[in-house]
């Protein structure tokens, strides 16, 4: 990876610490969260905060804080916030796929999955994708054409692991209260969902042992990428449609300028601002990394790209979502690696 790309990714991670955390102290968002924790309250539910989940005090405090933060997103009383959460959650599917694939490069599957389950995944959930994903991408190598695809297990089961370990807990946590689930049960479901990196990694590890790799690598990659692309694009289009149908302001896609912010008026406004920075910075990091990888694989410089490609890329970011475009670039590079490998093998024979 070039020094420029590494510096750009690290800069995004450092800026995330400033925009997300420092400014959250300055604009009063952290104080609002602390007040709700002190009064054991949730947004719109005074005195209804559940504080015991595992019996392990540090973990219980973390899960309690997660419930205070995510409750407005899952409750659905602020449509803009909930729909933005859907778009962000769907964009995490291709982000995580790229991280899973590249973490396996030159690694044993067990070691790679353990790193994802107990290091990278918990950091993403604890500190946020906007801060952690740029840092993870900054240490991932960029391979050149001719390199084998970066996994030694059936990545075609990535969709199954994400559906069971990520999407299903997400849907259950989003069930309406009190019509379908009780308030306490919803908080427990939100707490359960926080462990999705562990669940998905363990599911892939179990499949690795129970079902040896059978399908070709390029076919597995196509299955996993098609699933991730569908998730990301569907979430982005749903939010676009809602913003259009409800005449919502399109500025909801982008976070406010941090040094011009006012005090947050509500917990919902603070959560939306926090998620906006998380999504914007993590998606930007994905685009930076995949564009750099594409340029390295094709031997092109960014300035040498045609204006038509740039226009289509910008249109794709708007109408498909930034992570969908990043995944398309990554897939083209990965399949090119596979194709070049096969081509070289044919030539040598």
From Swiss-Prot:
One of its GO terms (cellular component) is membrane. It is found in: Membrane. Signal peptide: none annotated. Its EC number is 5.4.99.-. It is an enzyme of class 5 (isomerase). It is a multi-pass membrane protein. One of its GO terms (molecular function) is isomerase activity. Glycans are attached at residue 80. The chain crosses the membrane at residues 81-101, 116-136, 155-175, 189-209, 223-243, 308-328. Pathway: Secondary metabolite biosynthesis. Belongs to the membrane-bound ascI terpene cyclase family. Part of the gene cluster that mediates the biosynthesis of the indole diterpenes janthitremanes such as shearinine K or shearinine A. The geranylgeranyl diphosphate (GGPP) synthase janG catalyzes the first step in janthitremane biosynthesis via conversion of farnesyl pyrophosphate and isopentyl pyrophosphate into geranylgeranyl pyrophosphate (GGPP). Condensation of indole-3-glycerol phosphate with GGPP by the prenyl transferase janC then forms 3-geranylgeranylindole (3-GGI). This is Terpene cyclase janA. The gene is janA.
